[in-house]
Amino acid sequence: MRRHTALSALLIFTALSAPATRAAAAPDAPPDDLDALSLADKAPTEPAAVARPWRLFVEGSLRRTSIDDPDSRYESNRASIDGRIDATLTPGLRAVFSDRLDLRHSNRPGVEGDVNTVREAYLSWAPTDHQIIDLGRVNVRHGSAYGYNPTDWFKEGAVRSIVSLDPAVLRENRQGTVVLQGQQLWSVGSLTAAYSPALADKPNTGTFSLNVGATNPRNRWLLVGSTKFSDKLNAEVLLYGGEGIREQLGLNLSGLVGDATVVFGEFSAGKGPSLITQALGTNADKRFQTRAAVGLTYTTAFNLSLTAEAEYNEAGPTRRQWRALPGISPFGQLGLLNTSQTLQDLPARSAGFLYALWKDALVRRLDLSAFVRRENETRSRVQWLEARYHWDQVDLVAQWQQFSGSRQSIFGSVPQSRTIELALRFYL
């Protein structure tokens, strides 16, 4: 039990002992973890750094979580190693491997466990400059919105270890889907076809399991066409289906308004089960449902980006349906919350989402980011805040998150009401 605590402490000591005072830029953020951001540009006279095909960091964290009220708490610690390699084997052929190992321990039995996440492991072949074929585990992501992505269908069952509630980190730090995917490119758009075969019918929570039962539980397919109407307007049309899945139609739009504002809209429609039906395991008829997220992002001249988003999920419960759940099943509300987390779906019928990212906030090398989501059915909220300070090879991170609302509300029913975490990351 003590080995994880000792390993976390060792990682923190190693990070603190690393040279962190050189006036150079922080290492580039790995593409599979957007919460690590470079802040300083190299001087024009400095030679360009040679790009490496791999990225690797270790991280240690200490966390305190409150359950329902501040008088009931537990502590946990985590030691992680995270790496990615993107190597060219021959001209036109790449091999990509991305993995994260989280060693976790808590003084509350049954809360935490070690988990390894194979995010990506695939070969990518480009027979021509306009064609790409991928085979293996690929993190297939779609969606123009930020907080909620109705067209990101392969997110279901993909998150094994939640290290941050930041939507960007959740999208990156997840298992990919085993697919055969082909893409045809042209100057103003692309056409993509993906096939994901059934490989297992049940998830496997073993530490080093590939967990294909979560990512590939049935045969599925996806067709995507994208086009660029102008320098300021992009569109993407998607069609998704598979074994036991009614076809789903999706649309993504994004456009530039002025020099500092991006507007976006994401929509999906098709027949499917409600969250309540899935949480209770009943066989109710599938109904036509729509999902949507629309909003805008405004970026100021001083590196502050603000995003406002309206979210809608017709599969989510209304206030009356939510309050009726305990009468149907004693654990119906917790079951719905667990189902929405597994599916990465919005647990309410509608919500508002605000996100802010401030790079070089107040002082150079300090990033501040935060979001609040308020669902409109029971008027509860989830809030998250992160402060991240960068040295050359070390990040110091503080995170806080809280679920607020009455105990009968959607987010107020989450048992882990408040969490604070301190972490150190060391780039190798």
Annotate each predicted stretch with a short phrase.
Residues 354-356, 389-394, 400-402, 414-428:
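Outer-membrane beta-barrel "beta-signal"
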Residues 130, 167-320:
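Signature for the C-terminal beta-barrel architecture of outer-membrane proteins
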Residues 59-68, 94-105, 119, 133-135, ...:
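Transmembrane beta-strand segments that form the barrel wall of outer-membrane beta-barrel proteins
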Residues 73-81, 114-119, 174-178, 185, ...:
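Residues that define the transmembrane beta-barrel architecture of outer-membrane proteins
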Residues 46-58, 91-97, 129-131, 178, ...:
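Outer-envelope beta-barrel architecture signal
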Residues 86-200, 227, 405:
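Outer membrane beta-barrel
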Residues 20-74, 84:
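N-terminal periplasmic/intermembrane-space "pro-region" immediately following the signal or transit peptide
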Residues 85-91, 125-126, 137, 183-186, ...:
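Residue-level signature of outer-membrane beta-barrel architecture
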